[in-house]
């Protein structure tokens, strides 16, 4: 993670930190446009690492909104063995992509789309589900990265939006 922090620092970002070893990087930038930031980071990582790295930028206020969003019944979220995952996308999915995703709904897996995120309620262990990140990317027609809602809540709490 030290190398990742250095790469982001070399882009001119300040207050660069990593959060758990899964590629979450927190930074301050004068540029506010997420797509501009994503493109610049992706280009720099490709040049520095020699391979493509899909990048998904969210502001602190967006992260707070995502952490508070409740697309499913609370009883489903509290049930033993159920987990909620949030997939980050580079853009809002099309209606056609949403329809493709909903084909994967089962008694185990349910989905809700909210802006540039897909919420996945898994009513078993992720490893026991027939759904996967690869199927999500195929349905959406774009790259995605997934985090457990607990990670998102921790990020939002540790890095609150400034008022």
Please place each PLM-identified region on the residue numbering.
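Surface-exposed, charge/polar-rich loops and edge strands
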Residues: 1-163
């Amino acid at each position: 993670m030290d190398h990742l922090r250095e790469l982001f620092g070399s882009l001119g970002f300040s207050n660069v930190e990593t959060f758990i070893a899964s590629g979450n990087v927190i930074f301050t930038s004068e540029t506010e446009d997420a797509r501009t930031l994503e493109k610049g980071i992706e280009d720099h990582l490709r040049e520095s690492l020699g391979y493509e790295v899909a990048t998904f930028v969210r502001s602190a206020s967006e992260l707070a909104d995502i952490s508070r969003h409740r697309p499913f019944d609370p009883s489903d979220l509290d049930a033993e063995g159920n987990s909620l995952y949030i997939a980050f996308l580079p853009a809002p999915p099309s209606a056609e992509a949403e329809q493709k995703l909903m084909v994967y709904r089962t008694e185990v897996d349910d989905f809700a789309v909210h802006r540039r995120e897909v919420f996945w309620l898994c009513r078993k262990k992720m490893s026991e589900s027939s759904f996967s990140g690869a199927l999500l990317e195929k349905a959406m027609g774009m790259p995605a990265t997934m985090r457990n809602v607990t990670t998102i809540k921790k990020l939002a709490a540790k890095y609150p939006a400034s008022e």
